[in-house]
């Protein structure tokens, strides 16, 4: 009788892997969900495609063309995928040899870069950001040997600030002919002037990640994009699954990216920015809040006295925030998604009542 278990049959790196702790996986029984940087209210769409007996297009033409027009790039510079998370993984699969190459990222930042690399068996290297959360370019330069993909989130999740554009240029020069630089622009709709999409002609090794999950209010759709030069896109097409977007997803995405859909998105962004400033101003006056950091996104990072107790107290009241204590340099920090005015008021009232 064999004593080998199913777990024994698994790859060693998978057995040792800690899965990404998404907001939904962490759970909670709240009624004020401010932990996943989602848009706070639902948007409505009507399905127009009824051909569910047929496989969808591999790269739906209407979605690609609409997004290219919106982003100011050519259709051949756009790849659509199951969320930006799939784009993160595709870039590693296309450019990194497991057991040989490495990726590099700069914590505190988004957690899926490391999870995607570790799943595939690719080494992760980290260069923590400077005290102002900008790139440590010297540190990156020192660790670039063997690195094939560098991930930089801007605006950065969870800190909320933009990376200095001159630092991006320096990084792109450092990596020219050596590695792909990936600018994760999941939150760029909240600061569109900072996008690097206009740099693609200048830097053939630049790739940009985008999503419909944030400003487009479609987190449940799972639709993201990679913007890059055609040579990069063609390589990604070799490793992507044949039908990444279902017909209903492609249908809704095309509607969201129509001229009317873009107008509606920009109205949502203006509303969220106004609410963000209201919440920042209120947080700065609350005694348990030590520091509120500037944000270019739909969330706010703040440092609290007794942050773990504050987090649990609000959790028990049904207000679910995102604890960032385990991230480098974020001791005492909680991240708060900007929600509705009613949700902001629930947070403000609960924090004012904290005795710490």
From Swiss-Prot:
Per the UniProt entry, the signal peptide is none
**Cofactor(s) listed in the protein's UniProt record:** pyridoxal 5'-phosphate
- Which reactions appear under catalytic activity for this entry? L-histidinol phosphate + 2-oxoglutarate = 3-(imidazol-4-yl)-2-oxopropyl phosphate + L-glutamate
Q: Which EC numbers does the record give?
A: 2.6.1.9
List UniProt keywords, sorted A-Z. Answer: Amino-acid biosynthesis, Aminotransferase, Histidine biosynthesis, Pyridoxal phosphate, Transferase
Q: Which domain of life is it from?
A: Bacteria
| Pathway entry | Amino-acid biosynthesis; L-histidine biosynthesis; L-histidine from 5-phospho-alpha-D-ribose 1-diphosphate: step 7/9
Report the protein name in the record.
Histidinol-phosphate aminotransferase
Q: Which organism is it from?
A: Escherichia coli O9:H4 (strain HS)
